[in-house]
Regions:
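Walker A/P-loop NTP-binding motif
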Residues: 151-165
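N-terminal accessory nucleic-acid engagement/regulatory domains that precede
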Residues: 1-93, 97
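A short beta-strand element within the Helicase C-terminal
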Residues: 550-551, 560-568
Length: 568
């Protein structure tokens, strides 16, 4: 998407965020044309092509017709509300620039941001008051659907915590370094406002994300997109926390050594020798809170759980807030050990907040639930059992490509062609294959799938411009069959009326350019930072996104974001 397109989308969303007039198709179309003409007149930018204009209209549709309702929560009764009174007195500079960032850069609509505003207000009010003199230890849990916006919620919460005078923020990601780096990058863009890599190396202030909106406000990064916590770096960048006026954030893996190093550094340089506490209010957010954080042994505190607790007790005023889509381990902690009875573990004793998903979210209940609106997509298939049984050993291998996997590959090919036809060439597209937890089996599957994809690519390259004659070849006839079975019906489906649909002939004409860049990679054994290198493709001269078939197991199961995930 060009800068002109982004500016038009951002301007329209910003103006409409304060409007109460109902949005219509005609209004969107007129506003796009007015802004396009104005930019051409005032700044000399070329007017949009019909394809670019349609891309802008599609983006505005996606933003303006989505809303999120507020969530629901349960809490203990002794907590005193404090946040709304504090909010009226405090500056809201961190939240204000995050709000503008969501509007102008992420193209959220005003209603959705307003609901996020209300939701984060409610969660803030469930935390302790950072300005109170008395100490506190609050523990809570936020529950949301998979990939439904939990990250945006806790980034919003962190911005509001900074406005409310929280001085130390610790954000725990999963156990994988790639996930930590992804989360750090989002914090750079959504809260810190600076490139943390340049900041920790003292190479100057490079504005990113919210920093481009208001460079006068920033969080202080101790970790970066290149490095987890390091005591030497922390001492060089921060020194003593009490001497830093900006809120300081640590983005950490859930790793025993990392947690111990941070605890040791905090204790050595920041603790009050009299109270044996750090007298700064702290918010600890535990993303994927059911992963590695919960105690799994009766009277033996597990390493990660112990590390988190040791961080919490360092601070006189502290909050622990877990975020998860699978809360069972957290909610059903059995306080049957002496340790849990004495220290309460990380059980969310103070509140549980259930986040609502956006109304355009399609999750498990929309497909598998009773009377599910998308249940018609379900098909029963067990052909993979003959190729690689669900219960298998690390010595086993994928014997052949089952029909269902071939259909999934064909669907991914078609999806790439459709997105190119819609003008989304710059968008990343990913397909996930997760059918074994054994690395040896995953690597073998990668080779088999890669060989199959290369054969299809070769045939498509040779014949995609031969019209209907191409259908005599296996790859074309199979992909056309998948198009007829799964894609053709959407043209007449009212749920997809706003989308632009394409005939098989149109898809075939662009099929090879769309799929020629597809790569098959194994994601395992710590190679995710190298193999999920979306950032490198964003900086490439042709600005074409990564098109990837990711084969993996446990590494793909825990929080890693697969950009543009189309097919699983």
């Amino acid at each position: 998407m060009t800068d002109n397109q982004k500016n038009i989308i951002g301007t329209i969303l910003l103006n409409m965020s304060a409007s109460t007039i109902p949005v219509t198709e005609e209004m969107i179309s007129n506003l796009v044309d007015i802004n396009d003409s104005m930019n051409a007149r005032m700044y000399g930018t070329p007017q949009m092509t019909p394809e670019e204009r349609q891309e802008v209209i599609n983006a505005l549709h996606a933003a303006l017709f989505v809303r999120i309702d507020r969530g629901h929560y349960v809490k203990e009764n002794n907590h005193t509300p404090w946040y709304m009174a504090a909010k009226a007195e405090n500056s809201s500079k961190f939240w204000d620039r995050y709000r503008l960032y969501l509007l102008k850069e992420k193209h959220w609509n005003g209603d959705t941001i307003n609901e996020l505003d209300k939701t984060t207000d409610e969660i803030m009010d469930l935390l302790g008051n950072p300005d109170q003199a008395d100490g506190f230890m609050r523990r809570g849990l936020c529950i949301g659907d998979v990939q439904s916006g939990k990250t945006s919620t806790y980034i919003g919460l962190i911005n509001k915590a900074a406005d409310a005078h929280y001085r130390v923020i610790i954000l725990l990601t999963g156990t994988i370094e790639k996930l930590r780096r992804q989360t750090q990058q989002r914090m750079d863009e959504g809260f810190i406002g600076l490139d943390s890599y340049a900041l920790t190396l003292k190479k100057g202030h490079v504005q990113v994300g919210v920093g481009a909106i208001d460079p006068t406000t920033s969080g202080w990064a101790v970790t970066s997109t290149s490095s987890d916590f390091n005591a030497a770096t922390a001492q060089k960048v921060v020194g003593q926390l009490s001497k830093i006026s900006a809120p300081v954030i640590f983005v950490l893996k859930k790793n025993k050594s990392v947690l111990e190093k941070l605890e040791h550094w905090l204790r050595l340089y920041n603790i009050d020798p009299v109270t044996q506490k750090i007298d700064l209010p702290m918010l600890l957010i535990d993303d994927e809170a059911d992963n590695a954080s919960v105690n799994t042994k009766a009277d033996d505190v597990t390493a990660i759980n112990k590390g988190i607790r040791k961080l919490l007790v360092l601070f006189g005023r502290a909050n622990y807030v877990g975020f998860t889509a699978t809360p069972y381990a957290n909610v059903f902690i059995d306080p049957d050990s002496e340790e849990e009875m004495l220290k309460h573990d990380l059980f969310p004793r103070d509140f549980i907040y259930a986040l609502e998903a956006p109304d355009n979210y399609i999750g498990a209940r929309n497909i598998f639930g009773e009377d599910a609106p998308y249940g018609y997509m379900l098909e029963s298939s067990d052909d993979c059992e003959y190729a690689l049984p669900m219960v298998h050993k690390k010595e086993d291998s994928l014997q052949f490509i089952p029909e269902s996997l071939k259909e999934a590959l064909a669907a991914f090919f078609i999806t790439n062609a459709v997105r190119d036809l819609r003008g989304d060439q710059k968008a990343h597209r990913t397909m996930m294959i997760n059918i074994s937890r054994f690395i040896a089996v995953q690597n073998q599957i990668t080779k088999v799938v890669d060989s199959f994809v290369r054969d299809w690519k070769r045939e498509i390259r040779n014949y995609y411009l031969t019209g209907s004659e191409a259908l005599q070849y296996d790859s074309f006839s199979f992909i056309k069959k998948v198009y007829d079975k799964y894609f053709k019906q959407f043209a007449s489906n009212p749920n997809f009326a706003r989308l632009k649909h394409f005939t098989w002939e149109q898809i075939q004409e662009v099929l090879y350019p769309a799929i020629s860049r597809i790569e098959v990679r194994a994601i395992n054994g710590g190679n995710a930072p190298k193999n999920l290198d979306y950032e490198r493709y964003e900086k490439a001269p042709d600005d074409i996104g990564l098109r990837l078939i990711a084969v993996g197991g446990l590494s793909l199961s825990r929080g890693l974001t697969l950009e543009g995930l189309c097919t699983s």
